[in-house]
Amino acid sequence: MNFLDNEDINGTAYYFHSTDGDRYYEGVNLAVKFADEIKNYSDIWQWIKARIKAGNFAGIHVNDFIRWQTTDNKWIESRIAGINTYKRYGDREVPNHIDFISKDLWPTLHVMNPVNYNNGVIPMENLSGDGTKTAFVLANEMAAIASVTIGGTATTAYTYDVNTHTITFTNAPAAGTNNIVVTGTGSEYPWLASDLYLYANSLKGHVAGGTSKTSPVKLVDYTKDGIWSKLPEALKAVIVTKRALLPQRYSASGVLSNNNTWGWQDMGKLWIPSEIEVYGHGVWADNAWDKGGFVQYPVFNCNMRRVKGLGDGGGRTTWWLVSAGAGYTSNFCYVGSAGLATNSGASTTWVGLPVCFRIS
């Protein structure tokens, strides 16, 4: 059935195909529709935040959008993916919110990881003391150190230079083979351990440098050229961190090909959706740990809005999902350029990402 609905806003009648009948609704530009209302705020982001905080979603619908420019003049069209989709969810109850996912992708492609690896990453390195040496250069380019033990006893009597990857002890450790254990910071969660997470959120950190548990990590720094660094300050001011029940894939004993548990984690100010959030069910991430913490975003229900271009209005391009592929140690799921569900190695270079954020 195909019928029209209408809505009067400040004397202007807006006509659109019903959002509930045939699910065909192209969305409207909120800056135009609510121009008179927005005039009372410093910017459109303060307006939408006030609306959300008040729980006032009148006249605002899934697939409506706000267009904005990055600090380097790229256009992004942020579409409403869901209104209160996760309200009351979580270990920390989620309040009123809107999750936005860009209609098209960030204009630059980016790998999920520099190597085909989809596990969490917590680097560890063994060193051998000689009783006189105090400074050791690590093979791992650790962004930070979580703990150090000497002969099984924890110590904090050291400094660490992240730029040279050098740990310097106050006193020379006793002689012994592999008697010093240095454990870096990291995450058991594939998304939080990924290069793409750091790139999206303009962070500095270490990522997998190889495909085995013993492969040294490498340091990357996106603080000046990651996506978050390009967002306007007015938008940054209203974005909140998305928290979710993320799948974990990590074991100290070896590389895993499936998720082995889950946990409540902050996904970042900028994130990408899971396979469930796009398709509504598991396909290549068909694992209970991946499926139990998510629901499908309404914007993707019964349509092909998951087909996205590279850059604003660009040609159809594949894009990453947060879900690691089931049965693989190397792959992450992605949305194919034609809209199909598929997966590929984490170092695949022809995959992009949308700009996704939450305002509450």
Stretches with model-predicted labels:
Residues M1-Y14:
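Short, intrinsically disordered N-terminal pre-domain segments
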Residues L4-N6, Y41-W45, G59-W68, I145, ...:
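Glycine-centered loop/turn motifs
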Residues D8-I9, N84-V94, S128-T132, T159-T164, ...:
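Short, ordered beta-strand-loop transition motifs
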Residues I9, E26, E141-M142:
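Glycine- and acidic residue-enriched flexible segments with recurrent GG/GxG motifs
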Residues I9, T70-D72, I150:
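Structural motif
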Residues Y14, D99-F100, F136-L138, H165-N171, ...:
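Generic recognition of long tandem-repeat/solenoid scaffolds
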Residues H17-I122, G184-S360:
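Collagenous Gly-X-Y triple-helix signature in extracellular proteins
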Residues G120-G184:
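Extended beta-strand solenoid/passenger and fiber regions
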